[in-house]
Amino acid sequence: MRLFDLILDVIFPPSRREKAVQELTVEDFFVHPHTFALNDTNITSLLSYKDKNVQNLIRTLKYSGSFTAASLCAKILEDFLTEEIAELETLSDKSVIITSVPLGKKRKQERGFNQTALILKELHKMLPHIEISDEILIRTKETKPQTTLSRKERLENVANAFELTKRGKALPKNTFVILIDDVTTVGATLYFASRPLTENGIQVLPLAIAHG
């Protein structure tokens, strides 16, 4: 993914990339849900990071905090989650909460925002009947950026990096948490962010916008 990013920085400087994203619609993305397993956890992604439009979307969101990018990601999620949640509500008594992978304090200070929180803010406008909260998980240690690390290093980097908040610990056992991240590669972040919930008896759907 880092090679893609370096190439994109040459071909699409940030300002040009942001302009390109502003011209995109949901129809410009091929949504193809893909699920893979990491240990005992199934992780789902919706887009391939190999797609140029997806690369522009994620980088504009991640490094510019683009409202347009966040809104596009939210719309892509809405189309997928509407069906998933409807099926869940029909077949079970689960109560759905959508949350995001928390960003470390240092990283958030550097960027000035949490990109997945921006997505959830837009998603709440589209799914107002579903509870959306960023008060379920906290990141308990600062971690290195994952992009330059090997698979083993990625897993070690985020191991035990997340804990439940007081609110998270109090979730009823019939809660179904949809845990959102922007992009996943080996699934390490979503896996370790899910663990405090699953260890507390909560069912989780770890879900990334893109995989690559």
Regions found by a protein language model. Give the residues of each.
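Glycine-rich phosphate/pyrophosphate-handling loop used in enzymes and phosphotransfer proteins
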Residues: 1-212
